[in-house]
Each structure stands twice: as C-alpha cells, then as structure tokens.
Amino acid sequence: MSKYEFIKIEKKWQEFWDNNKTYKVEEDPSIPKEKRLYILDMFPYPSANGLHVGHPEGYTATDIFGRYKLLNGFHVLHPIGFDSFGLPAENYAIQTGTHPQKSTEENINKFKKQIKALGFAYDWDREIRTHEENYYKWTQWIFLQLYKKGLAYVKEMPVWYCPELGTVLANEEIIQTSDGPKSERGSYSVEKKYLRQWVLKITKYAERLLDDLEELEWPESVKEMQRNWIGKSTGVEIEFEIEGHSDKIKVFTTRPDTIFGITYLVIAPENKLIEKITKNNFKQNVLKYVKHEELKSDLNRTSLEKDKSGVFTGSYAFHPITNEKIPIWVGSYVLGTYGTGAVMGVPAHDERDFQFAKKYQLKILPVISKSGKNEILEKAFVDDGISINSPNEFNNLKNSEVKDKVIKWLTKNKKGKEKVAYKLRDWIFSRQRYWGEPIPILFDKLGNAIPLEENDLPLKLPEIANYKPSGTGESPLSRIKDWVNVKDMGFTRETNTMPQWAGSCWYYLRYLDPKNSKEFANKKKIEYWMPVDLYIGGAEHTVLHLLYSRFWHKVLYDLGYVNTKEPFKKLINQGIITSFSYQKENGVLIPNDQVIEKDNKFFDKKDNKEVTQVIAKMSKSLKNVINPDDIIKEFGADSMRIYEMFMGPLTDSKPWNTKGIIGVFRFLNKIWNLREKELSKENPPREIISELHKVIKKVTEDTEKLNFNTAISAMMIFINELLKYEKNYLNIFKPFIIILSPYAPHLAEELWEYIGELPSLFKNSKWPKFDESLIIKGKKEIVLQINGKIKDKILLNKETGEKELKEIAMENSKIKSNLLNKKIVKIIVIKNKLVNIVIK
C-alpha cells in the first residue's frame, strides 16, 4: 500500500499553482455581473509571532467558498495583502531594536510562507502592503479629498493619550477595565491631554451610516453594535439663560415632556463655560473637581453602576417656561463630546439624575405618574403616564401630548428647536508615532493648514534612526528639523502620522488595480468587481475598521470615484478558535508547560497540586498557542484545513484539540488508499450511485450556505460506503474528487492526475450536478443468494415484510433460472439485507 505522502504532494501542487498562476484573475467583460464574485478576508497585520491556528480559520472558509464558486463557473477574485503600518509593527521594532521597515518586511515574508503552506487560492499578483509608497500615496490622496470636502479639520481637544504607546488613541481604541480605562492594544494606562489633532468628520455621515445598514447582509449583532455606537436620538434642544451672564446653556433632551420636573442643570467637566460662570467662592473646588474627572473614561463616567459625582458652581439658570431659578452643577456623568455637553436634571424621571439628586439632596419633583396623582418615588419613574405638578395648560394630559405641546411652545417662543443627536463622535485621526502615513499638510507662519499638491504625493516617510516615541506628545518626526521645515517656502510640515485604520479603510479597492500609478483604481475595474460579495473577519472590528471603511467609501461614492454606496455586501464573523489552558484553585491560569498529566488528571509541576483544564484564548504568556507549521508538518495542510472547518459551525467559538485532527487525517488516508483498488470503468451499482448523488446534494447545499462542518461529515459517511465495494468506480470517484477539492485541494489535484485528467482540476473541471431522481429514498439494496452465492441485487422499500420478500425473490428471473429441477430446503430472510435460498 503506497503511503499518503502529504508533504511531497502539497509542495508539488503549491509549486504548480505558483508556476502556472492558476488563480490569477483578470477582468473579462464577456462574463455577466451575476457570475463575478469578489471574496475578501480581513487582511492580517504582520506580527512577529506569525500565524497561530486560529488565524487561518477565516482564510480557509473563503478559500473553500471561492474554489467551490470557481468550479461552478464563477469569475472569482480572491486577493491578499498586509496591513503593515501601525502600532503592532512599531512596538515590535522598539522592543527588538530593529527598524520597523526591516522588521515589517521580515514578518511579511514569514506570514507569506505560512499562508502559502496552506494552499490558499490567492491571486498573489494583486498583493498589497500598506506601508509601501505606491500604496500610501493613495491613502494620502484620499485624505486630501476628505480635506477638500471639509471633512478633515484641526482641533485642540481633550484626547486619550497613552504614555506607554506614546500616542493619542481614538475613543474606539479605549477599553474599560476594573482598573480604569486602558488602551485596547496592550491594555496600557491612558490619560486625558489637550492636544492639537486632525479629526475626520464622520458625524456628517451618521444618518447614512445608520440607514444603509438595512441594505447589508451582515450579522444582526454587528448591525446593532453599529446602531448603538452611532446612537441616534430625536428630541429637542432647549436654551437656558444664565443669571448675570449673556451666555446660554443649551441642553438636548429626548424627554421634553419632563421639562417641568427640572430641579437642576448639569454641565460636563469639559464645558468651556465653567470658568466663566462659576462664582469665586466655588471656583477652587470646581476646578479641582474638573481636573480629577477629566482623567476618567466616558464609560466609567456614564455607567449606571458607577457612583455619580458633582460640584455646585454657585450659579443659576432660568427655566425657559416658568422662569424659575435652577442651580447649575458640574457632573461627571455628562460628557462634553455628546450632545451639547449639558443635561437638564429631572431626578423624578431619569435614573442617573435620581442617583445624583439623592446623593446631593436636591429637589425631586415628579411631573408624570401612572395614576395622574402624586406618588412616593423609591426610584425614577420612566414610563408613560399622566402629567402632574405642571402649569395648567400642560397638566393632567398624557405625557405624549405634553411632549408635543412643549416642543410647539419652545419653538414658538424661540427657546428651543427640534433636533437629532448622535453618540458618534468625529474620528481622531492623528497619531504621535513614526510608523504610519505622513499627513500631507503644511502650515504657514500663522498656523493655517495648506494641503500638498497631488503631484507632490507621496509625501515619503523619512528614514530615521530614532523612531521611538518622544514621550512629550509629539511625533518622532518632529525631531527631524530638515524635514519639518520647508525652507524655500517658509512652511512647516505636519509631524503626526495617520492611524493604522487609514490603510485598511480602502484596501479592498486597491486590490482591483494594485499596480496603477495614475489613480487609486481604474473606475471600470471598480465597476466590474464592486461591491465585495463576501467579507469574512473578526467581530472585534465592528466599530473600528468596519465603520471607518464604510465612511471613507461613502465619501468616495459622493465624489464619484466608486459605484456602490456600501463596500461589503455580505459579512460573516468567524468564531474564535480557543485552546486548552490550566487553572489553579484560586482561578489563576498557568502556562501549559508548567503542567504535567498523570492518570488523565493535570498537575502544577511547581507544587504538584491538581489543576483544572479550561478553555482560554490563545496567548504567548499561557504558552497555549498552536503553531500551524507544526500541524502541517505532522498532518498536512489539507488535514488542518478540513479539521478547522469540521470543528463546528464557522461562526461558533471552539477549542482546538490536536487529537481531533487525527480523525480527519485518517479520513484523507482512506481516500488516498482507494488508489489500491482497481479503477473500474464499469457501471457502478445502483446504490452507490444513489449515495454519490446524495453526497453531491448535501455538499453543494452546505457549501453554498457555508455549513462546512456538515458537508465534511457527509463526505466522511460517503467514503465509508465507498470502501465497502471491491472496485473503485471511476464514475463515482471522479465527481467525488471534485466535491472534495475545495476542502482538500492538494490531495484532490493529486487524485485528479491519478485518474488521468489534466491539471489543474480547478481549471479543467466543473462542479457535478446531483440528480434527485437517482437518490434512493427509504429503500435498501437486498442481496438475493442461492446457497450463499449472490445471484442478484434489488432495491426494495425498508418496510417490505418477510413473506413479501420471499415472494419477490421467488419471482426474480435470475433466481428462477437457477431453481429449475432443484429442491428448496429452506429460505433464510435477513430483513433489509438478504434472501438466501438453500437448495439441493
């Protein structure tokens, strides 16, 4: 029996595909739009750690689907590239002392080698790298279009600054932990700083970003996360006059029906009015409080679970309708970046206001109740009801009626107006780091921004020896005086760089025309391929990359450069592949190499105490990362591909277990060993034809729906049936090789060649069609024997009884001819299997 030499086979076919550019694709106008398919993976950033077995899960899914569609006559574009600018690459460079240019190139080469070893059908001629000049030239060009459209502006603002990373971070890059706000990357401490920043006006597109979600075939959970992040509210903006000041406080509320329950106003610690309106004898306490609260995260300040804090300014505002005096407070739970940065305190009808009023013993005045009467409140009443304690014309009405009347009154008396507000904030676009796209802006002596001319692009990132963060909030580029100062013009350059998200905002468009030096992509090529039909990647990018790229795409659509309103038609989030780790009694996880197994139990080597095996995310510190190189070396790429898809539904999280891949490896060996049987061109038995069409149907339907695990299961069942036959029927084996090929392309190519077909299978075959009429439903093959020797095989319903089986057998022509002049001793019936007639 010849051995399944997967290493040799996989190397052979990977070289064949590379040398013959099997997966290269070019635009063919004769192919109709409905037969074109653009499939995309969220491209990787090339970390020094390389891939672990979780990374290829999404790549394998797109590869299977792309190959399946290719065999079904689709013109498939499936490109790959590297998100190579940004913090991960730069942090690694700082840790190792290797320049990010060098380390990034080395890491990309490592990634490419690992990706190619898995046999993905990428068109490598379209490879892109976001740190290369021919790419970031167009990132800079798109930034200039945003600037010219009034969507990029400079602003001095409070921002999250991470001393460890040495840069400003966007709100979306901050996470809340029990130890306070941290950077999403690295979980480092952050602080608030006032810095000059470039900001992109994503808020101008808030409504469209919200509305157009309805057109997308995305997971509902992702759409809901974007809706919540955008956070649309419809309400009214009310103006409050301040006693002794000409300034006014504007408040946005969705509950104007509660206006008569206002007992105080709260303004955000960031509000510029604070210093102006705070009374002198209150100023010291107020400014101390403001400084303290500015360091807290937005989530920490607004959470219902967190204690509400505030301080009185000593000043008062006037109620816009009753003219009553209302105390003005500064409070942590009001954000300067949301709405107007001020709220009206209605403690009877808002939970946060209720907590605040209770803490500071402020008046609580109910103006809506269920019964229409005063009731004792133990918590805020937030439901609909009847108005109470209100001026006559607003009293004793449904609160919905009060809402309409209040809006009309405020509008008529010019004290307020209807308005839509969003939680979404403009995107902080500056980073005080070296390894990123230089921002193509100059400043004159007055500080006015001047965009570079387009023919001066790319503005190249200068090579520097010291690329470490300055620690002062300035970019390392600010230290290169010859570069910063444009002497012949008297201008200075912008020294901040763009965030990592800039390059990934539009990379799917560059794949369409990666070598174009005159435009970011030819419009005809954009119209040929866009939108992306299937996009697979992690859910962690929901309010970062996915939102940002939708924003940039809409800007390019408005400018006439792209032909679709949305970039990604269908989105799938693959589940996380986890790994086993080990937990001590106190809940602490310990590294895997610190654990020993004895009698199916696990123990800590250090203290010999038993530990519990648990499922955890793969991490270097826990030493539970599984390297795909090791798996491929032991079992082969095809085994790894199939195992990752066989573990469970694509969108579910599942733990990696190397023992589980052994079963998949055996499955591929069974297929390989079919070569040992005679390859017969005879007509196959009726039942195996039925099984073939059954498996074609199942694999077709499941692959179309991305239900890869059940498709693989069906193929395993089929192979077990096929192994029962003495011969390997060509008419069965050939179509099976084709349906196997998206899942195990190397083995399929080898078997395709073995049966005498020309490679590549993916260029010289078509996906087989199943014939429903050939699928036997509810029937079994019954063997007819005389003295234990097979004379015929017939198909009968499973329910056929013993008496009827005997009658059918006796009427069979082949049996009849062998019974002439013979004495029947007995008839043996085994239900659903055989009828054996014993004669003498």
Swiss-Prot record:
Cell compartment(s), UniProt: Cytoplasm
Chief subcellular location: cytoplasm
MF (Gene Ontology): aminoacyl-tRNA deacylase activity; ATP binding; leucine-tRNA ligase activity
EC number: 6.1.1.4
Chain sites annotated for binding ATP: K620
Catalytically driven reaction(s): tRNA(Leu) + L-leucine + ATP = L-leucyl-tRNA(Leu) + AMP + diphosphate
Chain location of the short sequence motif 'HIGH' region per the record: 44-55
A Pfam cross-reference name: Anticodon_1
Keyword list, A-Z: Aminoacyl-tRNA synthetase, ATP-binding, Cytoplasm, Ligase, Nucleotide-binding, Protein biosynthesis
Short sequence motif named 'KMSKS' region, residue ranges: 617-621
Transmembrane segments annotated in the record for this chain: none
GO cellular component: cytosol
InterPro entries linked: aa-tRNA-synth_I_CS, aa-tRNA-synth_Ia, Leu-tRNA-ligase, Leu_tRNA-synth_edit, M/V/L/I-tRNA-synth_anticd-bd, Methionyl/Leucyl_tRNA_Synth, Rossmann-like_a/b/a_fold, tRNAsynth_Ia_anticodon-bd
HAMAP family assigned to the protein according to its UniProt record, in alphabetical order: Leu_tRNA_synth_B (MF_00049_B)
Protein's name in the database: Leucine--tRNA ligase
